[in-house]
C-alpha cells in the first residue's frame, strides 16, 4: 500500500466557508472544466492506496459540507462511481469531517488516468496535469478546485491573507506557475507536512478570487476593506485631535 497524497487541512474561517460555498455552485465554461476541478480536489483531499490485489482505493476528506457535495456530484456525474460517505465529529473542536470512499469498482484506475492523477506505465503524476490545462477556463477550474480542497482566507479586517495547503512541493510550484500570467505572485512555505501556497497582497487576493469567478466574495472583501480603511481614518483623526489637545494643555500650563 502506498499513499499518493494526504490533505492536512487548514482551519476553516466563516469567510472561507462562504467562499467555498460560492465556488461549489460555479459551473465551468466547457465540459472539460468539471474533470479538471475534480482532478484538483482529488489530488489534495484524497489519499490513494494500492491494494494487495493490485486495485486502487481512494478516501477523500473535507471539513466543508459544500465541498463534500461537489465531490459526490462530480464523481457520480462524470464516472457513475459509488461513493459511500461517513461523517466524523471531533469531541473537542466539534468540527465535522466528511469521509468519502471510492472503491475500485473495476474502473478507478481508468478514472485516475482520465484525471491525470496517474499516468499508465509511469505511475502517479504529482504535479499539475498540464495535459488537461490548455484552456484558460480549465486553468481557472483547477485553481477553483484546489482552493475548495485546501484553501483558507482570513478575515479581511485583520491580517488578511489567502492560503492553500497542497500535497507536495511540485503541486504547489505548478499552481504558483499557473497564477503568474494572471498577475498573482504566490509564495510557498512548508507546514505540518504540507506545502502551503500563500498570497498576502490584497489586490492579488482579489485577482485570485476573480480568477476563480467568486464575484460575491470579491464584493465582500472589498466592502470589508473600505470599512477597515474608514475606521483607521477615524482613529487617526481622533488620535491627532487628542495629541493636539495634549499639546495645547501643556502649552497653557
Residue spans for each PLM region:
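Generic, ordered loop/turn and secondary-structure boundary motif
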Residues: 2, 24, 43, 49, ...
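DNA-contacting interfaces and partner/effector-binding or oligomerization modules
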Residues: 62, 68-225
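N-terminal, positively charged regions that mediate nucleic acid binding
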Residues: 11-57, 61-71, 75
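Short acidic (Asp/Glu) and glycine-rich catalytic loops that position anionic groups and cofactors
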Residues: 48-53, 122, 155, 232-236, ...
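Single conserved hydrophobic/aromatic residue that forms the stacking wall/gate
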Residues: 1-9
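Generic detector of short, well-ordered, non-transmembrane alpha-helical segments enriched
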Residues: 6-7, 36, 141
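Short, exposed beta-strand/loop patches in secreted or surface proteins that constitute
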Residues: 3, 48, 186-188
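Extended mid-to-C-terminal alpha-helical interaction segments
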Residues: 211-253
Amino acid at each position: 500500500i502506498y499513499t499518493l497524497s494526504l490533505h492536512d487541512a487548514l482551519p476553516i474561517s466563516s469567510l472561507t466557508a462562504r467562499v467555498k460555498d460560492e465556488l461549489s455552485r460555479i459551473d465551468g465554461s466547457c465540459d472539460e472544466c468539471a474533470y479538471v476541478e475534480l482532478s484538483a480536489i482529488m489530488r489534495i483531499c484524497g489519499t490513494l492506496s494500492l491494494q494487495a490485489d493490485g486495485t486502487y482505493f481512494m478516501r477523500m476528506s473535507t471539513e466543508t459540507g459544500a465541498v463534500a457535495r461537489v465531490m459526490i456530484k462530480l464523481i457520480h456525474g462524470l464516472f457513475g462511481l459509488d461513493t459511500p460517505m461517513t461523517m466524523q465529529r471531533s469531541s473537542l473542536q466539534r468540527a465535522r469531517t466528511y469521509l468519502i470512499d471510492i472503491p475500485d469498482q473495476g474502473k478507478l484506475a481508468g478514472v485516475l488516468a482520465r484525471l491525470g492523477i496517474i499516468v499508465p506505465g509511469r505511475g502517479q503524476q504529482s504535479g499539475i496535469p498540464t495535459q488537461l490545462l490548455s484552456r484558460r477556463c480549465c486553468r481557472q477550474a483547477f485553481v477553483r478546485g484546489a482552493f475548495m480542497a485546501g484553501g483558507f482566507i482570513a478575515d479581511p479586517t485583520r491580517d488578511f491573507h489567502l492560503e492553500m495547503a497542497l500535497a507536495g512541493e511540485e503541486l504547489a510550484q505548478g499552481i504558483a506557475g499557473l497564477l503568474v500570467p494572471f498577475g498573482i505572485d504566490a509564495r510557498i512555505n512548508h507546514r505540518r507536512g504540507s506545502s502551503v501556497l500563500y498570497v498576502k497582497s490584497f489586490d492579488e487576493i482579489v485577482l485570485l478570487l476573480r480568477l476563480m469567478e467568486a464575484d460575491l466574495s470579491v464584493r465582500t472583501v472589498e466592502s470589508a476593506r473600505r470599512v477597515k480603511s474608514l475606521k483607521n481614518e477615524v482613529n487617526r483623526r481622533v488620535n491627532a485631535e487628542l495629541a493636539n489637545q495634549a499639546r495645547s494643555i501643556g502649552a497653557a500650563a
